[in-house]
Amino acid sequence: MKYFVVALALVAAFVCIAESKPAESEHELAEVEEENELADLEDAVWLEHLADLSDLEEARGFFGNTWKKIKGKSDKIMLKKAVKIMVKKEGISKEEAQAKVDAMSKKQIRLYLLKYYGKKALQKASEKL
């Protein structure tokens, strides 16, 4: 679970970096204005913004695919954890637990895991007190 949180934080950081826009200096804007013979500074900013859009689209595509891969792997890990917990908690065979988990929706599996780990965390906290 810790690795999932770290991976999620890394993906969020990369998305923020990809969507951040570098600061534009007056010198860069003047060059764009001279190249395109623009009289208005706002037009130069607009053209520079259009030039940056293609890079942002490529970055979004990369991070979107990465996010889908991470989400798929986390779903598989949740399924395996739910099966292990059912086997341990209910004392049933692995096949029976797998059948129960397969019948559950992703939302039900998440709730089951949150409930289990919530109780476990509460027990640890009460032991420390």
From Swiss-Prot:
Q: Which GO terms describe its molecular function?
A: toxin activity
Q: Which GO terms describe its cellular component?
A: extracellular region
Where does the signal sequence lie? 1-20
Q: What processes does the entry annotate via GO biological process terms?
A: defense response to Gram-negative bacterium; defense response to Gram-positive bacterium; killing of cells of another organism
Provide the propeptide boundaries: 21-60
Q: Where is this motif: Processing quadruplet motif?
A: 57-60
The record's account of how the chain is modified after translation:
Cleavage of the propeptide depends on the processing quadruplet motif (XXXR, with at least one of X being E).
Q: Which InterPro entries match?
A: Latarcin_precursor
Pfam families from the entry? Latarcin
Query: In which tissues has expression of this protein been reported?
Result: Expressed by the venom gland.
Which superkingdom is the protein from? Eukaryota
Entry keyword set: Antibiotic, Antimicrobial, Cytolysis, Hemolysis, Secreted, Signal, Toxin
Localization terms from the record:
Secreted
- Please provide the record's free-text comment about the domains of this protein: Both the N-terminus (61-94) and the C-terminus (99-129) of the mature peptide form alpha-helices which probably disrupt target cell membranes. The linker region (95-98) probably derives from a processing quadruplet motif (PQM), found in propeptides of many zodatoxins, hinting at a fusion of two originally separate membrane-active peptides.
Question: What family name appears in the similarity comment?
Answer: Belongs to the cationic peptide 06 (cytoinsectotoxin) family.
What functional role does this protein have?
Insecticidal, cytolytic and antimicrobial peptide. Forms voltage-dependent, ion-permeable channels in membranes. At high concentration causes cell membrane lysis.
List the protein's name: M-zodatoxin-Lt8e
